[in-house]
């Protein structure tokens, strides 16, 4: 972490102060650690990333736990994670079934997270500074859904559209909503969180709506015919 530099943004605006009041329980810490791919990766989460200080929401680990709390407990009936339910219910299950190796790194500023899988590849998801300090809690939770979709063998298949904030013409978009790619999963999660998220605040739900609409406008080669 000594080679990483970052500035902690407003923790009320990001939702970290709100969610941080819940995660500082050994039961939650143990559950997140054993469920979402941290096990065996202490070396990636110590040395300033927060392993020694898991309740400090200035640090990456606690900020990750905040997003996992949202991912896990935002459905009113969160114990029901059946795939026949809305994505707000089953996103937690989808993430834990597809991500079993979660690592923290500084990154080079070009991505908030990356997934790696395939033959002769150490299957893993890496999280970078941009996720913890450039995203609010709802985007972080949805980033897990996005990367889990990649780990479920669904790559991006198109270029970003004209005017996209992600760089018009660059690779990394989904062709359309029906492709059911990572952007569709991420946007759908944010949509449901906005519509029915529980154990949260109205500000966090509005943030999810804002980001979901941003992805609809910018992350699909053919814009989906929806607005949140």
Question: Whereabouts are the PLM-identified features?
Answer:
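Substrate/cofactor-recognition hotspot
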Residues: 144
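Walker B catalytic acidic pair
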Residues: 147
């Amino acid at each position: 972490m000594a080679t990483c530099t970052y500035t902690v943004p407003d923790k009320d605006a990001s939702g970290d102060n709100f969610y941080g009041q819940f995660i500082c329980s050994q039961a939650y810490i143990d559950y997140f650690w054993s469920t979402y791919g941290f096990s065996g990766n202490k070396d990636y989460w110590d040395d300033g990333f927060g392993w020694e200080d898991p309740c400090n929401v200035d640090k990456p680990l606690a900020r990750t736990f905040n997003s996992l709390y949202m991912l896990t407990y935002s459905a009113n009936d969160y114990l029901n994670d059946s795939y026949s339910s809305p994505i707000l219910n089953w996103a937690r299950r989808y993430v834990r079934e597809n991500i079993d190796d979660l690592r923290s790194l500084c990154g080079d500023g070009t991505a908030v997270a990356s997934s790696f899988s395939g033959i002769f590849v150490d299957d893993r998801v890496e999280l970078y500074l941009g996720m913890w300090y450039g995203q609010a809690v709802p985007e972080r939770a949805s980033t897990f859904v996005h990367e889990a979709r990649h780990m479920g063998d669904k790559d991006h298949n198109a270029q970003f559209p004209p005017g996209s904030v992600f760089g018009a013409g660059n690779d990394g978009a989904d062709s359309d909503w029906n492709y059911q790619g990572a952007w569709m999963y991420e946007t759908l999660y944010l949509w449901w969180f906005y519509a029915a998220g529980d154990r949260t605040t109205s500000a966090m739900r509005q943030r999810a709506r804002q980001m979901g609409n941003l992805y609809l406008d910018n992350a699909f080669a053919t814009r989906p015919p929806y607005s949140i």
